[in-house]
Curated annotation (Swiss-Prot):
Protein name: Dihydroorotase
GO molecular function: dihydroorotase activity; zinc ion binding
Gene name in the database record: pyrC
Pfam families reported in the protein's UniProt record: Amidohydro_1 (PF01979)
Active site: D251
Length: 347
């Protein structure tokens, strides 16, 4: 039997899907990302959303101002697609190096997505230009039809929206974000070099039983929602396969405690502080620690056409216990795995 490593040295990772919010929340959560990640794709679903080059530049400056001294962190900005968005704004932002990608939220699919796209046909001109200039499209892949069960919305999206979109724009670089189903995993793994996906820590570690059995656990509630264990296992097998078009995207999405623990709680898991420990734990359980660095640090830059980070981090096989709460002024955040321990810590 091969001895398991006690220290893993990997290239500094990037987070290819994160919500940093703004103001006090931004200042509170950013250090948990900037300490260990070199770059992050920052979601644009603020209120109001980031739809112009000017608003993206201003938001990037607010993020950089909140980076703790000594952290080398670079936010990668995205543009929020709307039915009425001017295609020239997208092209200009990408060519200036302000926008790294554009984000497609189906209208009302998730938090702050009411301004989202009502039909792909409404943005076909934008997608055509994005394909031409090589700008990636990031997709929250769920249909919003009320007649479709919440557990089926990702698979239905692939069938009715994503596949036709990719047929129409075959050379458009597409990232199907935070995939949660065996259908999505199979679709991406069997796809071509223009299709990639991110996977979150919570969808690899947990399934819907963890959220619903023995009481409702609101801090595991996110969108897309946790699925049954067969889907969780399919995701785990996909990352263990070493597919080069799967990469780290935490979808870390903080909400104040009272907005999660309510009669109508918000969707989102704040996992930045536990993400790397969680990924290492899952990859070890799948006997795939040799695939961890590529998933965390190499596959994303390759797909985006960016260099890998030139610094390194180390994961140690030692117990780390995560905080029960994180102070947020007069409020607090309940982080992923609050009060729980894992056997991989990060330095």
């Amino acid at each position: 039997m091969t001895a398991q490593p006690t220290i893993l040295k990997i290239r500094r990772p990037d987070d290819w899907h994160i919500h940093l919010r703004d103001d006090r929340m931004l200042e509170t959560v950013l250090p948990y990302t900037s300490r260990f990640f070199g770059r992050a794709i920052v979601m644009p679903n603020l209120t109001p959303p980031i739809t112009t080059v000017a608003s993206a530049i201003a938001y990037r400056q607010r993020i950089l101002a909140a980076v703790p001294q000594g952290d080398d962190f670079h936010p990668l900005m995205t543009c929020y697609l709307t039915d009425a968005l001017d295609a020239n704004e997208i092209v200009s932002g990408f060519e200036q190096g302000v926008f790294t990608a554009a984000k497609l939220y189906p209208a009302n699919a998730t938090t702050n997505s009411s301004h989202g796209v009502t039909s792909v046909a409404n943005i076909s001109g934008i997608l055509e230009k994005m394909q031409k200039i090589g700008m990636p499209l990031l997709i929250h892949g769920e249909v919003t039809d009320a007649a479709v069960d919440i557990f089926d919305r990702e698979a239905r999206f692939i069938e009715t929206v994503l596949e036709p979109l990719r047929q129409q724009f075959p050379e458009l670089k597409v990232v199907l974000e935070h995939i949660t189903t065996k259908e999505a995993a199979q679709y991406v793994v069997e796809g071509n070099d223009y299709l990639a996906a991110t996977i979150t820590p919570q969808h690899l570690m947990f399934n819907r039983n963890h959220m619903l059995v023995g009481g409702v656990r609101p801090h595991l509630y996110c969108l897309p929602i946790l699925k049954r264990n067969t889907h969780q296992q399919a995701l785990r097998e996909a990352v263990a396969s070493g597919c080069e078009r799967l990469f780290l995207g935490t979808d870390s999405a903080p909400h104040a405690k009272h907005r999660k623990e309510s009669s109508c709680g918000c969707a989102g898991v704040f996992n930045a502080q536990a993400a790397l420990s969680t990924y290492a734990t899952v990859f070890e359980e799948m006997n795939a620690l040799d695939k961890l660095e590529a998933f965390c640090s190499l596959n994303g830059p390759r797909f985006y056409g960016l260099p890998v980070n030139d610094s390194w981090i180390e994961l140690y096989r030692e117990t780390v216990t995560f905080p029960e709460e994180i102070s947020l002024g007069d409020e607090s955040l309940i982080p992923f795995l609050a009060g729980q321990s894992l056997n991989w810590s990060v330095r």
